[in-house]
Design a protein with these regions (language model features):
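A cross-family acyltransferase "interaction/gating" segment
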Residues: 1-62, 83-101, 109-121
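Short, structured interface segments
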Residues: 60-74
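Mid-sequence helix-capping/hinge segment at a functional interface
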Residues: 74-82
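Metal-cofactor-binding active-site regions of metalloenzymes
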Residues: 105
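Short, non-ligating residues that shape and space the ligands of small metal-coordination modules
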Residues: 108-109, 126-127
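Anionic N-terminal interaction surfaces
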Residues: 132-187
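Phosphoinositide-binding peripheral membrane targeting modules
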Residues: 165, 171, 175-225, 237, ...
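Canonical pleckstrin homology
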Residues: 216-265
Length: 265
């Protein structure tokens, strides 16, 4: 990794700041809903000059990743910090893909501090400790992190199957221009090799393929679109027919990229 090469060449000690509580205050999928709580900043030495002089680039990279990795849920459990808000569950409906009780897909709704499955009624409130409080007869994971980890494991298992395929009809915009009109539409498919698009862009037939190897990850807006850079057409935002599938595409693609890169070393 380039950051590890830079650190090795510089040879200077590296300090790191780890922020606790920011995700629980304002998560990237909450659509701006802020919770009142506490944020702590922890300063630590990530690497000394002596360590840098003897570490491999991979060891340097691993040390850097470990120094900035955070787990707000573990921090909350150890610190006991509570969060207040009347929209604690906002955005959850866009990342809870599978119901743990009835296995329905894309069935969750959220309003205020509550989530519920539109298929079986499985429901819970989000408490001040950001853990789920299941309502009568409901079955939910302990918190959002545990739910996402369970889903991610299933997405990865699906992606490892030989016949793996995700497909969706899409509408397309130029990335970064969310208020602009759509510039195209078509079909987006992801298999174990990469992402394929076929459709119309700017009034012309368009087709392209992006190999997982050159795409280290997918970003976008949960519940809405995926961002995919493309050489001929620039950065594009693909709005899936089922926006709640964005997280599924994201985790599957990141796994397939990592698997390809690892196999080459």
């Amino acid at each position: 990794p380039s950051i590890a090469r830079l650190v090795r060449r510089a040879g200077a000690p590296v300090a790191a700041l780890r922020i606790h509580g920011s995700f629980l205050t304002l998560s990237r999928f909450s659509h701006g809903a802020m919770n009142k709580g506490r944020i702590e900043i922890e300063k630590r030495m990530a690497l000394t000059a002596e360590q840098i002089s003897v570490y491999t680039e991979q060891q340097i990279y691993d040390a850097l990743c470990g120094a900035i990795a955070f787990d707000d849920y573990a921090w909350q459990r150890s610190s006991g910090v509570l969060f207040k808000g009347n929209k604690l569950a906002q955005g959850y409906e866009n990342i809870l893909v599978r119901c743990p009780k009835c296995a329905a897909r894309y069935s969750y709704h959220a309003e205020g501090n509550r989530i519920w499955c539109g298929s079986c009624g499985n429901s819970a409130d989000v408490g001040a400790d950001m853990r789920f409080i299941p309502l009568e007869g409901s079955n939910v994971p302990a918190d959002l992190q545990e739910w996402i980890r369970t889903q991610k494991a299933q997405f990865i298992q699906d992606a490892d199957k030989k016949d793996f395929l995700l497909a969706s009809e899409v509408r397309v915009k130029s990335y970064g221009l969310s208020n602009s009109p759509y510039i195209g539409e078509g079909s987006l498919r992801m298999d174990r090799q990469g992402i394929h698009f076929k459709g119309v862009l700017d009034g012309k037939d368009a087709e392209f393929f992006v190999d997982h190897q050159i795409l280290p990850g997918l970003t976008g807006e949960f519940g809405e679109y995926l961002y995919i850079p493309q050489a001929d057409h620039g950065p594009l935002a693909f709005y899936l027919a089922q926006g709640k599938a964005v997280i599924e595409w994201k985790f599957a693609q990141e796994h397939l990229h990592s698997k390809i890169v690892t196999s080459q070393h």
